[in-house]
């Protein structure tokens, strides 16, 4: 605001001074003319013809032809189809990262693509503007005046300005696009700044067009640039430092793509919340009053039947073709192919012929970033991270132009480590344990579990690129099995009580996946009316509802305070409490078997701690799933008249059963590690530093079993005592008195963590003292959390007063450690009571990550 105001003042000052110029010009003009007389004035004239300007340049013919001036290092772009109004046809514009950072924390992965944007080139005299159209606000009216009114009501965005360098008599123009192709279109600098990695900017002297990967095709033009981002900061951010040879200069490649828009025969399909798709939306200001302003359609690929009247086993004019990255090694490559190919089952169930959905290895020499290829890429990173599926889509219709799957290679290594921790397969080498000699891949249970996971992961992320959203109810509703859930490995105990990995992950596409593809991709016979088609689509979902299938997605599953009893990440089974008991039994069996046989001979013994992390916390996500029964509400994405059930409070008996199971995760028997494990864990040796994947420690270099227990307890307490859950417990107890009350939950937690085995003088008692302190801290935090209702905060404060009263009135404990612990609790509560408004709760003890590292919001 201030900058614009100053600029206006400068313009006015210049205008004012211009009034004084004529006299000065009369005085100095003859002198100037005399001084310039020996040289002829430079004629601006019209720009040269394109053929003359580009003579000797390397020409790349395509949608937007390119001309490379190797001597000057300039790349020219030809615009051949400017209309009488000076505007080109609309194009789809995207950018991407062919070369990434390899950092989950930075989130700038190899193969990452941007959203598609509708752009056009506009000429105004010697200028060419690249204009992004505003597709968020539209008019479907046939009246040009109505459409113009909407267009003029909202801004467009001029992304770049060029100067005409040459033109031809047919109206084609040539522009120097070098600076455009060398700018940071992907927003790398902004990303680094937002992540506090430093102020990076492009160094033009260290950036250039990457001509080897710059191409022009009839339907798309691809320009790649090697960009070097530099910073003057003395200590660049750690994330950049982790992955870059010199953190002061990070060199990446960015790709700019101009793509011909698809033909207009694609029919958008309406978005319905319970159909399981991502929406593409815009506002239509021509809709009648009373009708929705926001128009929502699903994202999906184009499929056209060869026979318009075919009903079943219909052949497609152009099947949906995906390719797997040639950089994926075997046996990973075969697993990716197999898992992604599962989707053909769903397309067959939706009336298409076998082979309508195809997956093959990317042809040798093919460019995975080319928009013509739907790609499944194998990406390496510094730490394990998320895999994800993205799509470049036509903003006008929601048609998917390019599916782009990114699969992180370290996921498989993490799963292999989990399998090793569960089974401890490396017996004494002198005993001739065959695994040490190298199992055949088909005989290695850990490898088979990993490959099963990779098949499922390939199917899951490919599903996103077909337009499908997560269905986080699938794993807990038996009729709704789906690859679009996050599966926890279904580890079981065999008849002898040994760990069995053979059923860890499901095979093939699920029942819900077939429903979703049926809704999104079934094509009806020619001449089917729009109303009849809508009825048929509604019937697909109604039949799924009747079969007991449920769709619940991210917004209702990810928050710690979410209420849905079936929507969870990394869980299994229709009965969360029973499954938690089963998972705890598997965990106990694996811990009893855990020891040096979990690592190969020659591995530092300290690596056992890394193996122990996923095993000790094996129950963490099933615990979350079980907690969501408590203060839970069962609901669907209802539409009026669809016949779905109304929301209902979870049965009180189920809530109490869940609470009983959850409290076991706070019990000393669960959280105390045996001496047989503690005696094996040395500090880390040189070359093997502790990382974020290690347990927290209050004991310096040594393994800290107390901190490990605190971190596990806080995982439970954070979800159980979430402010939204606490507030719902009050409401639901008033509506259904048999439901657990907030006060009852608090009392149950306090009773559990007050348990002291062996009269308080034992390792398990020390663990539980730490857990009790964490529980009180969690309650104090809830008591001052403004997100909780006032009554919830009041009830928690009342309970804290009860704790204080009990601590100060019961006889002093005989055990010295217990007496000291009690005094510390009293001091902490008194600190809170003296000034609740100033009280700062201690943060939870952070457990090592269980999910892949990085931001999970988009995955």
Where are these regions (language model features)?
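Sec-exported extracytoplasmic/periplasmic mature domains
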Residues: 341-352, 463-464, 468, 489, ...
């Amino acid at each position: 605001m201030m900058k614009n105001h100053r600029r206006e003042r400068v313009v006015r000052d210049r205008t004012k001074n211009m009034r004084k110029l004529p006299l000065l010009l009369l005085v100095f003009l003859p002198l100037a003319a005399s001084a310039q007389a020996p040289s002829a004035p430079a004629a601006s004239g019209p720009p040269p013809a394109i053929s003359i300007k580009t003579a000797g340049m390397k020409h790349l013919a395509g949608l937007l032809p390119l001309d490379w001036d190797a001597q000057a290092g300039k790349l020219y772009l030809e615009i051949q189809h400017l209309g009488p109004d000076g505007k080109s046809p609309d194009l789809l514009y995207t950018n991407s990262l062919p070369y990434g950072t390899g950092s989950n924390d930075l989130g700038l992965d190899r193969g990452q693509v941007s959203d598609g944007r509708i752009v056009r080139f506009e000429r105004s005299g010697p200028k060419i503007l690249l204009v992004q159209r505003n597709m968020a606000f539209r008019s479907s009216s046939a009246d040009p005046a109505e459409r113009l009114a909407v267009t003029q009501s909202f801004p467009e965005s001029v992304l770049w300005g060029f100067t005409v360098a040459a033109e031809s008599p047919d109206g084609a123009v040539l522009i120097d696009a070098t600076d455009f192709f060398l700018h940071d279109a992907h927003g790398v600098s902004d990303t680094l700044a937002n992540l506090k990695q430093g102020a990076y900017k492009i160094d033009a002297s260290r950036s250039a067009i990457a001509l080897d990967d710059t191409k022009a095709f009839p339907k798309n033009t691809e320009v790649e640039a090697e960009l070097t981002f530099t910073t003057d900061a003395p200590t660049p951010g750690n994330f950049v430092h982790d992955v870059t040879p010199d953190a002061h200069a990070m060199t990446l490649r960015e790709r700019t793509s101009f793509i011909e828009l698809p033909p207009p025969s694609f029919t958008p399909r309406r978005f319905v919340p319970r159909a399981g798709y991502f929406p593409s939306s815009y506002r239509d200001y021509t809709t009648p009053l009373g009708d929705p302003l926001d128009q929502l359609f699903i994202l999906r690929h184009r499929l056209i039947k060869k026979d318009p009247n075919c009903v079943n086993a219909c052949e497609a004019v152009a099947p949906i073709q995906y390719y797997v990255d040639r950089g994926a090694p075997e046996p990973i490559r075969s697993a990716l192919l197999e898992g992604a190919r599962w989707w053909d089952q769903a397309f067959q169930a939706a009336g298409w012929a076998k082979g309508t959905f195809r997956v093959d290895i990317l042809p040798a020499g093919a460019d995975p970033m080319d928009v013509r290829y739907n790609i499944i890429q194998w990406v390496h990173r510094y730490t394990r991270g998320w895999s994800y599926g993205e799509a470049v889509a036509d903003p006008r219709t929601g048609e998917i132009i390019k599916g782009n799957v990114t699969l992180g290679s370290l996921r498989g290594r993490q799963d292999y480590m989990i399998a090793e921790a569960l089974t401890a397969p490396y017996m004494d080498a002198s005993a001739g344990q065959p695994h040490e000699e190298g199992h055949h891949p088909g005989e290695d249970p850990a490898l088979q579990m990993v490959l099963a996971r990779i098949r499922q992961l390939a199917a899951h992320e490919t599903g996103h690129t077909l337009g499908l959203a997560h269905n986080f109810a699938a794993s807990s509703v038996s009729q709704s099995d789906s690859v679009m859930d996050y599966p926890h490995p279904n580890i079981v105990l065999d008849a002898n009580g040994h760990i069995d990995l053979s059923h860890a992950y499901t095979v093939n596409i699920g029942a819900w996946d077939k429903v979703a593809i049926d809704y999104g991709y079934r094509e009806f016979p020619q001449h089917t009316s729009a109303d009849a088609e809508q009825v048929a689509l509604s019937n697909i979902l109604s039949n799924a509802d009747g079969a007991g299938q449920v769709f619940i997605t991210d917004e209702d599953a990810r928050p710690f305070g979410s209420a849905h009893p079936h929507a969870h990440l990394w869980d299994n089974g229709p009965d969360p409490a029973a499954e938690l008991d089963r998972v705890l039994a598997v965990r106990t069996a694996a811990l009893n078997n855990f020891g040096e046989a979990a690592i190969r001979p020659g591995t530092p013994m300290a690596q056992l701690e890394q193996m122990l992390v996923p095993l000790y916390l094996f129950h963490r996500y099933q615990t979350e799933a079980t907690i969501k029964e408590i203060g839970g509400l069962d609901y669907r994405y209802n539409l009026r008249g669809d016949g779905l059930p109304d929301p209902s409070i979870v049965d009180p008996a189920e809530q109490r059963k869940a609470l009983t199971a959850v409290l076991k995760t706070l019990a000393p028997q669960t959280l105390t590690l045996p001496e047989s494990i503690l005696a094996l864990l040395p500090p880390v040796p040189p070359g093997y530093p502790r990382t974020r994947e290690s347990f927290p420690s209050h004991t310096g270099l040594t393994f800290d079993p107390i901190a490990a227990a605190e971190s596990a307890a806080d995982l439970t307490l954070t979800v159980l005592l979430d402010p939204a859950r606490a507030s719902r417990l009050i409401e639901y107890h008033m509506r259904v008195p048999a439901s657990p009350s907030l006060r009852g939950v608090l009392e149950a937690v306090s009773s559990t963590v007050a348990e002291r085995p062996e009269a308080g003088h034992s390792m398990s008692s020390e663990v539980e003292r730490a857990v009790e302190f964490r529980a009180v801290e969690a309650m104090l935090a809830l008591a001052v959390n403004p997100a909780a209702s006032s009554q919830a905060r009041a009830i928690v404060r009342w309970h804290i007063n009860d704790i204080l009263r009990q601590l100060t009135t019961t006889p002093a404990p005989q055990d010295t450690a217990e007496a000291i612990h009690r005094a510390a609790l009293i001091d902490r509560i008194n600190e809170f009571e003296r000034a609740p408004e100033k009280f700062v709760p201690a943060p939870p003890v952070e457990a090592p990550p269980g999910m892949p590292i990085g931001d999970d919001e988009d995955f």
